[in-house]
A protein has these predicted regions:
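Sec-dependent N-terminal signal peptides
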Residues: 1-19
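Generic alpha-helix initiation/capping and coil-helix boundary signal
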Residues: 4-10, 43, 77, 84
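Histidine-centered metal-binding segments
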Residues: 20-70
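Primary mode marks residue(s) on the alpha4-beta5-alpha5 output face of response regulator receiver
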Residues: 51-144, 148-255
Length: 255
């Protein structure tokens, strides 16, 4: 199930770096997800697990309820708008640079599960993901967000990540929380071996849309509980015309 790690990795990138320990480096396969303790016997289901996790995230954010945590929108403070605009301007430079997705691939971005049909494809740079665990560089987003058009990809946005250990005050230092709302995925019960397909079915117990939200309930059903599976993340759409669309929470939920 380490590929569930690889899949969940995309969104939250860098759980290992936030803990700063060799043990957590096993979680780098999936940005922001540390499932390093999973049994080796799960390895045969890696591809399925990845697809399940991707499916759970794809277009279902609004259904996640207790599986998603959003930062609170703060009262604007002096300098917030200017600071956020600096991030937007840097992101626009990124958009121009990587408009051709081949450039992104040549510079180390990897398509996250290209074999899984998605509304939006994350091209993830794991070196930038590592950097994001320690400092914030808006010119180095963890992921580039592309929409597929035939055999081509159209760049529509970027994704920044931050360690799951960060407080909201820490996140506010990166991008003011009066402007942007970060989110993380929580209360994840991984399905036991042989039952991964259940995460894709109707009324699932397991996964990001599952009914199980507590450690006790997960144990009782043979699953493996993870209080947080991704690092903090925020999507930014810098080519939009106004701040509401650039930092759109609704679009972030839907993507």
């Amino acid at each position: 199930m380490k590929t569930l790690l690889t899949l969940l990795c995309l969104a939250g990138t860098l759980s290992f770096a936030q803990q700063n320990s060799p043990q957590d480096m096993k979680g780098m396969n999936m940005p922001g997800h540390d499932m390093s303790q999973m049994s080796a016997q799960d390895s045969g289901e890696d591809a399925d697990a990845s697809a399940h996790a991707m499916h759970s995230m794809e277009g279902h954010h609004m259904d996640m309820g207790p599986h998603m945590k959003m930062t609170a929108l703060r009262t604007p403070q002096a300098g917030d708008a200017e600071k956020a605009q600096q991030v937007v301007e840097a992101a626009r430079g990124v958009m121009e640079k990587y408009k051709d997705y081949h450039v992104a691939l040549n510079e180390g971005f990897k398509i996250f599960h290209p074999e899984v049909p998605q509304k939006q494809y994350h091209f993830t740079n794991y070196r930038y993901a590592m950097q994001a665990a320690f400092n914030f560089n808006p010119e180095h987003p963890t992921s580039l967000l592309y929409e597929k058009n035939g055999d081509d990809y159209r760049l529509v946005g970027v994704m920044y990540t931050a360690p799951k250990r960060f407080t909201e005050d820490d996140l506010n230092q990166r991008i003011p929380l009066s402007i942007a709302q970060w989110h993380e995925h929580v209360n994840f019960c991984a399905a036991p071996t042989g039952r991964k397909q259940e995460m894709l079915g109707p009324n699932p117990k397991f996964g990001l849309r599952g009914s199980i939200i507590t450690h006790q309930e997960c144990d009782a059903n043979g699953g493996e509980f993870h209080p947080i599976i991704f690092n903090w993340m925020v999507h930014l759409y810098p080519l939009e015309k106004d701040a509401a669309q650039i930092w759109s929470v609704d679009r972030q939920h839907a993507d």
